[in-house]
């Protein structure tokens, strides 16, 4: 069977369904795929297809996720849905599926529940920038006032976590009825996707962001200078660009890129995804090392203290067998290197058990190029015991 060609004319966005268990996330995912395939052509997905989520390994953590794709008139979407609550937490923290926006599913019959709150908080912490709300199971509630109350409750909850609760689109529908093909409820799915199309902005492409490349290796070429190799994480770099070497050292160092090579060939420029060697002017071999990053000046800064949202691996996932306490000192693995850090648990939290997720503050012994949303692993003796994401920078 010939593979379908990927249509690049439409903008691409990554979204996912979030919300409390049994509020209808997977049914909604199936309904969107089915309704849009009727409207746009393409393949429908059944509930069973999506619910049997394959296990994936992301940085040693086992996560069950389903990936579904569909398109609207203007966009192509990759949609991620997770069967279990723990899978969501892991998915969002590891960034296994980076989301440009999310659809928060809330059952109109139950209103917001504990996981609704937790998923909104996680979205805030890990940087899911935009949410649209789908109030599900509205066919089961015939009291208009009750629906309005639930909507107000959801909006208040979103505002509590710094989302614009008053402006977020809230669509009332029934995923199950839409999946069963009832036209009035199918219309609500179309309305939902119109809201997603218009409310969730087109994500900035990796190549349009400011240049950054984590340094993987460094070597000197006699007579030419020092070369740093690595994979460009974002943006573009051209010969003649000024870049900063950031991290580990107290001060960032500025230098000019005098050559860009890929597969032993010279290039004019390189962009996100390319594995390159960058020749740096006036940089001694010992002035740059693995773990630092090359970046557009001023675009990212070195830090030691931050708040993080962390998932601690369970024993079954190969994590710790025992809890840890405040002042725990593991290695924090950022991009290409380990740095020792000190964990401080929030007030009133005495210890963290394997399998938990927790917000903690971390102090690294050396500065690293960090920003909100930077992902890291926590390691002990080379094995991964946790995964986290920088929620806010403190110093």
Swiss-Prot record:
Q: Which residues form the signal peptide?
A: none
Record-listed GTP binding positions: 19-26, 81-85, 136-139
- Provide this UniProt record's keywords sorted from A to Z: Cytoplasm, Elongation factor, GTP-binding, Hydrolase, Magnesium, Metal-binding, Nucleotide-binding, Protein biosynthesis
User: What would be one Pfam family of this protein?
Assistant: GTP_EFTU
- Annotated region G1: where? 19-26
What would you give as a GO molecular function for this chain, any one? translation elongation factor activity
Binding of Mg(2+): at which residues? 26
Question: Record's GO cellular component, any one?
Answer: cytosol
Spell out the residue ranges making up region: G3. 81-84
Coiled-coil segments: none
Reactions it catalyzes? GTP + H2O = GDP + phosphate + H(+)
Where it sits in the cell: the answer is: Cytoplasm
Q: Where is the tr-type G domain?
A: 10-204
Tell me where it mainly resides. Answer: cytoplasm
- Which stretches does the entry tag as region G5? 174-176
Q: According to the UniProt record, what class of enzyme is this? A: hydrolase
Q: Where is this region: G2?
A: 60-64
User: What is this protein's function per UniProt?
Assistant: GTP hydrolase that promotes the GTP-dependent binding of aminoacyl-tRNA to the A-site of ribosomes during protein biosynthesis.
NCBIfam families linked: EF-Tu (TIGR00485), PRK00049.1 (NF000766), PRK12735.1 (NF009372), PRK12736.1 (NF009373), small_GTP (TIGR00231)
Indicate the quaternary assembly.
Monomer.
Name of the molecule in the record: Elongation factor Tu
